[in-house]
């Protein structure tokens, strides 16, 4: 959520920056109307309440003096009715303004490339050499099915499309990657491990920006009004909702493994085979709470931490600086890390690393004090995948495949695989 005072005094500047996102700003224009009316109603209500108090005191005096107060009593009733009407209108205007504020995306950072679509994203850097195969490489779903380590067909029978059973070496590879990533981020990168709940309430989804805009993308448990988490970002960020932190606590860095659940409502017909787009998938998420002046340095560190996973796995990748039209709703700046997938003949996203500045913290009321009695300020929040496990499995299967259909296990994972060197 944006700062309403900043928006009020910089309306045209904010509008111009949001236009770079390619957003429909039709409703945005109502901000000035609603904000002005809200302030008018507050003034009118306070004036009438003040008058009501004065009249009430006058009535008390008249009654003590045993004088006729009927006219003032009637006047007070009229004032009371007007106050009630104004309070009702104020409540409606504030609800409309709150809904509008929750629907306004974050302001792009000045360093985000200006553009409309993914074609305008900028390559920040690449790492590793794309392997040239002496044979026609197979897609990971065929490799895994032939090896008996992934079973999409039976998962479809048990649940439906976009689900999978991991079996044998496939299940162990998934588990190995989870342990490897958590060990790396906690032991070498300084994150604290968190295992979060997989269900959250509506306030948590609103705090990180999934609601109200993206409710159709979420799995909701209607009886409780809980949501299955689309990412560990949601519960981990909301750990500190409605809290005031001390300066000495910052930065806070969490690494959280979780399963994630997404309806993929807008992805019908895309990536229908394999692990790239599943309704349920595992992920290690990196979440940071930092002082505002440190957030862009921390974004670079977070992105480097996610990249380190791919470097140790020796998987070629590139880092994209996302343009203003491809930032997503909540980010002020975002890097996508894309790993090379041979069967696609291109790079595919495996991590998004974002700086939300105070956007989430304002929605979730997460603040800190620089001094013991100082005025609370909003922290800046960041997060990134470190990494998406299923897509990492897909990248390993395809990049490490051999002509006979076996898979060489990356060296860094072998201690987690019981010393095995090959999946066959």
Swiss-Prot record:
Instruction: Give UniProt keywords alphabetically.
Output: Aminoacyl-tRNA synthetase, ATP-binding, Cytoplasm, Ligase, Nucleotide-binding, Protein biosynthesis
What protein does this entry describe? Serine--tRNA ligase
- Tell me, in a sentence or two, what this protein's role is: Catalyzes the attachment of serine to tRNA(Ser). Is also able to aminoacylate tRNA(Sec) with serine, to form the misacylated tRNA L-seryl-tRNA(Sec), which will be further converted into selenocysteinyl-tRNA(Sec).
Instruction: Give the reactions, separated by semicolons, that this protein catalyses.
Output: tRNA(Ser) + L-serine + ATP = L-seryl-tRNA(Ser) + AMP + diphosphate + H(+); tRNA(Sec) + L-serine + ATP = L-seryl-tRNA(Sec) + AMP + diphosphate + H(+)
Where does the protein end up? Cytoplasm
Q: Does the keyword Cytoplasm apply?
A: yes
CDD domains per record: SerRS_core
Q: In which pathway does it act?
A: Aminoacyl-tRNA biosynthesis; selenocysteinyl-tRNA(Sec) biosynthesis; L-seryl-tRNA(Sec) from L-serine and tRNA(Sec): step 1/1
Gene name as annotated = serS
What quaternary structure, including any partners, is listed in this protein's UniProt entry?
A: Homodimer. The tRNA molecule binds across the dimer.
* Family per record: Belongs to the class-II aminoacyl-tRNA synthetase family. Type-1 seryl-tRNA synthetase subfamily.
The record ties this protein, via NCBIfam families, to: serS (TIGR00414)
Which organism was this protein described from? Bacillus anthracis
Residues at which ATP binds: 262-264, 349-352
Q: Which Gene3D superfamilies does this chain map to?
A: Bira Bifunctional Protein, Domain 2, Serine-tRNA synthetase, tRNA binding domain
InterPro entries named among the record's database cross-references: aa-tRNA-synt_IIb, aa-tRNA-synth_II, aa-tRNA-synth_II/BPL/LPL, Ser-tRNA-ligase_type_1, Ser-tRNA-synth_1_N, SerRS_1_N_sf, SerRS_core, tRNA-bd_arm
Q: Record's superkingdom?
A: Bacteria
Alphabetically, the GO molecular function entries are: ATP binding; catalytic activity, acting on a protein; serine-tRNA ligase activity; transferase activity
GO BP of this protein: selenocysteine biosynthetic process; seryl-tRNA aminoacylation
What is the E.C. number?
6.1.1.11
Entry remark concerning the domains of this protein = Consists of two distinct domains, a catalytic core and a N-terminal extension that is involved in tRNA binding.
User: Can you quote a single GO CC term?
Assistant: cytoplasm
Detail which positions bind L-serine: 231-233, 285, 385
